[in-house]
């Protein structure tokens, strides 16, 4: 019975965690009620049915350990003894397995032997509909195949032009052969004139067609580049907030800039060289007709080029990886330094920052130099093979001419044809560094484009928000191995109610509002607005109806009017002014020289802190949200600015649900109800005077500290 109970707990915990990973919220008690009918725990069948009810695609498979790196992770390792665990990542290089121990509620790294000892060969693969679509649209080199198919007509035209170019390339050596073997021997001036005119016509057509091919090809690849750039930016803005919190700004910027490498590769000569290489088989047939021996020399050189590239490529890729990492470090440090310039100057730490920059820059230059040296060695190796083949062909060709097996004209024609074959090979070999760089660029961009966006279980047509809020049995932490931030939080807020939330730093106040904005999905429990589970709601629909004012608000480098009307650029001036008056910002805006057309500067640098905050409040109010969140919105203001805002607070709160998070208790003392949080739990709630009556309570303690 105990084993069944344990299996029941672990199966349910696993389903909860996997659903959370796919941005789907669930109520464990409801799942247990529906699918654990006999009370003996979730069987394999009932587990799969429960997953299906959550719009998850779950499949039970048997997989050998050697093939685990091929499956989509995370997955549930199903154990007959009920001791299930999650398989998160397979490190094939070091033969290690990152798992999540559901019994200990902690991540665990297992060696090959440890994993083999506990793995019974059964997996449950879990994906959501959204993630299945994401896998089908996974960004790698195959992403360009649909783009090529889309522009197949243009690429077909390019292919036809390439065929004509190769025909002209085939004709030219034949003209030279005729001149050497016929015209010079028989002194045929009339034939020479005809061949010269014909050759001139061929050259003109070749130049025109070559330019046309480059133009058409560049035009189509530029359109692919535009599509990729647009998709990248849209996807970037659709990523969850956790993606940006777990990465440095400089890293993200560096990955986006990798688009330039792909652009240069697409519009360069590499792809046209591939087309030229495809026609080499025709040239080989003609060359074989001239001299099988000389053709075998050329054919024998091709494996040399391939083997040399195979030898160089892994080393080059490792060094390019290192170069990118150093470049990303520099980018991140530069962004951090520019962002923190006020602090750097205030603390006079420019020498220390410069020293760090010099070291990082030296590291980048060193890694870049190593890439250049290796690329040069690779190119010189290609040149060595080419020159060696040329010498062998010259020696062997001369012998064939002397022995009468080959004419001088045929030897010249053969060398011209071999040049047409080898030239694209050499160009591709020399462009191999670019290809390696593009491979890394695609991988880096894939980190952005393959990251799951904010998804929701279904597109429900939810009505306009009224303002009722409920947190039910909320348990949350930011990462599986991180401490619990919210634990068993239950809170109901009626529409039109003004709620104050206070507590020590790190007590979970701001996290509660982040769950309300659906920045995160709770590990357990539900967040409801007007009775609707936010896990089912479109995040954009939700956030458009919630106004948020933070302690540090960001203004864009635009006019005041554009900042206030950011969510609706075509908004009437009357609405903008009304929101500004409500936020107490209209008077100081009117005193500015350009008024509402004043450019605020980057992040609002041209305004004072109080002015920025009031514009941020106006921006939050302009859409008349039914729910308004003030997260330490007045804590950094001077008393005069705070007084102006607090004077208008009654008008601001009218007709909407308001959540005030503050350290200053004076900000929340007039709230309809005050929630006191401590270590992720609600420890007290009531009105200001009611909470003060409990002299041993946390609120009374904080109030006494502020009075003193």
From Swiss-Prot:
Transmembrane segments: 159-179, 192-212, 270-290, 296-316, 389-409
Ranges for domain Peptidase C39: 1-126
CDD domains: ABC_6TM_CyaB_HlyB_like (cd18588), ABCC_Hemolysin (cd03252), Peptidase_C39_likeA (cd02417)
Domain ABC transmembrane type-1: 155-437
Cell location: Cell inner membrane
Membrane topology annotation: Multi-pass membrane protein
Keywords, alphabetical: ATP-binding, Cell inner membrane, Cell membrane, Membrane, Nucleotide-binding, Translocase, Transmembrane, Transmembrane helix, Transport
One GO BP: proteolysis
Chief subcellular location: membrane
Cellular compartments per GO CC: plasma membrane; type I protein secretion system complex
Catalysed reactions listed for this entry: ATP + H2O + proteinSide 1 = ADP + phosphate + proteinSide 2
SUPFAM superfamilies: ABC transporter transmembrane region, P-loop containing nucleoside triphosphate hydrolases
Residue intervals of the ABC transporter domain: 469-704
E.C. number(s) listed in UniProt: 7.4.2.5
Residues annotated to bind ATP: 503-510
GO molecular function: ABC-type transporter activity; ATP binding; ATP hydrolysis activity; ATPase-coupled lipid transmembrane transporter activity
Assembly notes: Homodimer.
Family: Belongs to the ABC transporter superfamily. Protein-1 exporter (TC 3.A.1.109) family.
Biological role: Part of the ABC transporter complex LktBD involved in leukotoxin export. Transmembrane domains (TMD) form a pore in the inner membrane and the ATP-binding domain (NBD) is responsible for energy generation.
Full protein name: Leukotoxin translocation ATP-binding protein LktB
Gene that specifies this protein: lktB
